[in-house]
UniProtKB/Swiss-Prot annotation:
EC number: 2.7.7.18
Source taxon at top rank: Bacteria
Swiss-Prot/TrEMBL keywords: ATP-binding, NAD, Nucleotide-binding, Nucleotidyltransferase, Pyridine nucleotide biosynthesis, Transferase
Xref: InterPro entries: Cyt_trans-like, NadD/NMNAT, Rossmann-like_a/b/a_fold
Organism: Streptococcus pyogenes serotype M1
One Pfam family of this chain: CTP_transf_like
Function description: Catalyzes the reversible adenylation of nicotinate mononucleotide (NaMN) to nicotinic acid adenine dinucleotide (NaAD).
SUPFAM superfamilies xref list: Nucleotidylyl transferase (SSF52374)
Protein name: Probable nicotinate-nucleotide adenylyltransferase
NCBIfam families registered for this protein in UniProt: cyt_tran_rel, nicotinate (nicotinamide) nucleotide adenylyltransferase, PRK00071.1-3, PRK00071.1-4
Transmembrane segments: none
UniProt gene name: nadD
Amino acid sequence: MALELLTPFTKVELEEEKKESNRKQIGILGGNFNPIHNAHLVVADQVRQQLGLDQVLLMPECKPPHVDAKETIDEKHRLRMLELAIEDVEGLAIETCELERQGISYTYDTMLYLTEQHPDVDFYFIIGADMVDYLPKWHRIDELVKLVQFVGVQRPKYKAGTSYPVIWVDLPLIDISSSMIRDFIKKGRQPNYLLPKRVLDYITQEGLYQ
């Protein structure tokens, strides 16, 4: 399959396709969001704008196969922080199907469910350039690419390659991670400006990551 690149025409093509078919174009950004931070929000918002998507859904994982369960706080806190982070933010919403399903969160199972529930939606699954390299190892990847269009986020001039169809979006590198924020808090440092203030206030109020 050919590699797809984001060109000046990509957004126009997506918008024309949407007008012709009346199908919704929805992005999905999955993650542990432990906690959500500003880099997550920038990626979601910029992909939505650059591709002309109707909306991007932030989808918290229940038990991701690649994350240490010991480092993950209760889902009620992760969900509440997501809610606080996107208050009054246009074009972003939350999808909770993986939390509701429980168990290990395989993307194939999730997208099969969502495409069956929303047959009038074209889904765009957003991943980082580093994750594109691992697509061959994803659970049922050859079936997954028939359900969803992958969107790879890479920093400008960074070139990643894959045999799977990927739309590339260039974004400046924002070097923020959830583990960095957790480490700051454990060491008694305030992670100011790394995440929304409402989220930081909630973390402080609930005594998380101490």
